[in-house]
Amino acid sequence: MKRTYQPSKTRRARTHGFLVRMKTRGGRRVLNARRAKGRKRLGL
């Protein structure tokens, strides 16, 4: 059985990237929460 995590930079960016977060209201909430917490990296 193969492992479930098969890394791909493109897929990672398309699902968890900054632009994707900015698209939806919920995603913007995620970014604002991370800003408030003081995260160094917000999206990908």
Swiss-Prot record:
Tell me the organism's taxonomic lineage.
Answer: Bacteria, Pseudomonadati, Pseudomonadota, Betaproteobacteria, Burkholderiales
Q: Looking at the keywords, is Ribonucleoprotein present?
A: yes
One GO molecular-function annotation for this sequence?
structural constituent of ribosome
Record carries keyword Ribosomal protein: yes
Keyword annotations for this protein, in alphabetical order, are: Ribonucleoprotein, Ribosomal protein
- Protein name from the UniProt record: Large ribosomal subunit protein bL34
Protein family (similarity comment): Belongs to the bacterial ribosomal protein bL34 family.
What's the domain of life for this entry? Bacteria
Gene Ontology biological process terms, A to Z: translation
Q: Which Pfam families match?
A: Ribosomal_L34 (PF00468)
Q: Which organism is it from?
A: Methylibium petroleiphilum (strain ATCC BAA-1232 / LMG 22953 / PM1)
One GO cellular-component annotation of the UniProt record comes to: ribonucleoprotein complex
